[in-house]
Structures are given as C-alpha cells and as structure tokens.
Amino acid sequence: MSSKYPRSVRCCLPLWALTLEAALILLFFFFTYYDASLEDQKGLVASYQVCQDLTVMAVLGLGFFTSNLRRNSWSSVAFNLFLLALGVQWAILLDGFLSQFSPGKVAIKLFSIRLATRSTMSMLISMNAVLGKVNLVQLVVMELVELTVFGTMRIVINNIFKIDYGMNMMHIHVFAAYFGLTVAWCLPKPLPKGTEDKYQTTTSPSLFAMLGTLFLWMFWPTFNSALLLNPIERKNAVFSTYYALAVSAVTAISVSSLAHPGGKINMTYMHNAALAGGVALSASCHVIHSPWIAMVLGLVAGLISIGGAKCLPVCFNRVLGIHESHSVHYTFGLPALLGEITYIVLMALRVVWASSNMIGFQVLLSTGTLSLAMAMSITSGLLTGLLLNLKIWKGPHVAKYFDDQAFWEFPHLAVGF
C-alpha cells in the first residue's frame, strides 16, 4: 500500500523548471530578436493595451476563477501565474519556429506576445479540469505538450485550410476544454472517502472566484477581438460579445433562482454561466451584424451552462468516470460547441441567401477544422494523461487531492500532516 503522505518535489521541480528556463533563455539568445521596424506610436500603444487586457484576464481572471475550493485556492492562483509565465515563453518560440519554415531568427513583436498569451490561456483553461489532482511538475509537462499540439494544429489549419490566425484561434475553448477533460479521465479516481470536505466551497474563496469571473467578464470583448485585423470584424466582435455577456449574466442570476426550491441564487451557477455568452461568441462574434442574434446566443449559452452544472455531474461525469473540479465542461466546453455550431449555421444561411459556392466551401472548412480540433484535443489529451500517470513525476496521492498543504508551507501549523 502506497503512502498517503505527499511526495516531495524538492529536487524534481527546481531541476525540471530551472533546466527548462535555461534552455528557453538559450533559445531566445540564439534564435530571436526584437523587430526593429518603425511602427505608428498610436498603434503601438493600442496594441500594448490589448496585451495588457489579455494579461489581466490570464493572471487575475483565470487565476482567481479556480480559487473557489477552500483548501486549494493558493495553488490555483500561484500555479496559474507560474504556468502563464513559462507558457508564454514557449509559445512565442513555438509560433515563431512553426510559422517560418526557412531557417533564421524569429522576430518578436507585440503581436507575438498577444498570440502567445492567448495560446497559453488554452492551457490555463485545461488546467482547471485537473487542478488539485496533479503537482506543478505534471502541470509543466501538460503545458509543454498542449501548447505544442495546439500550435501545430493552428499551423496546420493556417497552411492547409488557409484560415488566418484570428479564425483558427476560435477553437481555443473547444480544444482546451476537451483536452483537459480527457487528461482528467486518465488520472486516478475516484476520490477516497474522508476527503469530500476538500471539495467544498466557502464564502471567502467563492468570493475570490467570483472576482476572477468579473475580470474575465469585463475583458472578454478584448479576448474575442484581439487577433482580428479587419476593423469591421473587430467592431462586430466587441459589440456582439458585450451583448452576449450581458444577457448570459442576467440569465445566470434569473435561472439560478428559478432552479432553487427556495428561489435562492447559487454562486456557483453565477460564477460559471455569466461567462457562457462570451465563450459562445468566440467563434461567430465577427460575423454577427445584429445585437439580437448575440443576445439570443448569450441566453442559450447561459441556459446550457446552468443546465450542465445541474445535470452533468450526475448524468454525464459519473457515466464516463470523469471528475473535473472546476466546471470546465459546462463553462467552456458546451458553450464553445454551441458557438462553433452557430458559426457553421450562420455560414450555411449565407450560402442560401447568397448562393455562393465559396461560402459553401467555407462551411465545409469550418466543419473540418472543428472536427480536427476535437480529434487532436482528445487524442493528445489521452496521451498526456497516460504520460502524467508515470511515477517519475511524483504525483500526489489521491488522499491529498485538492489540498494546498501538500505543496505549500503553512508556518502556523505545528504539525504538517
């Protein structure tokens, strides 16, 4: 019988992380340079503001978003920052190497950081499905694999399907959610008896998690429009995302009250469903020209998110044996699928209205890229999950799931365990 005491990562984590960081520094030294071309100062400032918004979403939004478990909030915030800092470095190099087939150094621009931050956010979303069940070393391995597969998928979509960066990034939520869920399916389960209390939420952590939701809610229009170069598409994305978020927030509170026998509002439902509209608009926001379409999509996404939160843990997760701790499926996965299907339907309607073979071809491309994203996320997630089960990573024992005390120093405690 294996020990229930947490396995120390004192040697494994510093060795792995610092070696990786040293390798990244060498790669940046030999293969990158700052782009020296003159840019319009006003455009540079605007571009930096977009980078700043994305960083706020990644650090504060996704960091606090997963801090609702009362004994796992420290890991949520700090691991999120660590993985973002490491992932952006790897994503910049990866995008540079994959996007230029000819040998030479990679030019680093603000757009490179913007693209890398969005790519890394896919990992931060996937992490929600396994947070509390893996250590930081396993998360680093998971990040390297996911960012590599995600970057490769985008390059394949860009070069084979001829879809630009703004469009092929719309699969980020679908890829991230189902990659994370597949990894979670591979990890040891179920939770042993006596640790259910660690999976409970309390007032203060739930409030911080709601703070993360608010940061994400405020900056989601920037997230959906960050990589769009056409001014009209960017305007449509900002407007449509805002209306969808507004309706999903109203839906979250209203339907949460309706779902409770006493008419009380569930903070967890609010925490998840308020963002559903923004997630659902990630694929189609740039092609929606009327507010009512975005509002209807936000309403449906909110309903799906709350319905998933109420039914999926019983009907779906238990059947498939998936235990994911932070509502990834019905906060990101299902609303994102709704958005992808909506985009395909909107493009199909344009075929009917315009009788254009080119638009019809684009519908087929959109369906193909969605299928590719799903296939690559599930396949790579399965392989990553099997890789994380190897004993060399010193993963935590199931008795220490969702327990910050397994990784953090608590000076006020006289006895560690």
Swiss-Prot record:
One of its GO terms (molecular function) is ammonium channel activity. One of its GO terms (biological process) is ammonium homeostasis. GO terms for cellular component: plasma membrane. Keywords: Membrane, Transmembrane, Transmembrane helix. InterPro entries: Ammonium/urea_transptr, NH4_transpt_AmtB-like_dom, RhesusRHD. Its main location: membrane. It is found in: Membrane. The chain crosses the membrane at residues 12-32, 44-64, 77-97, 125-145, 172-192, 203-223, 238-258, 265-285, 287-307, 331-351, 358-378. It holds the Pfam family Ammonium_transp. It is a multi-pass membrane protein. PANTHER family: AMMONIUM TRANSPORTER (PTHR11730), BLOOD GROUP RH(CE) POLYPEPTIDE-RELATED (PTHR11730:SF43). Belongs to the ammonium transporter (TC 2.A.49) family. Rh subfamily. May be part of an oligomeric complex which is likely to have a transport or channel function in the erythrocyte membrane. This is RH-like protein.
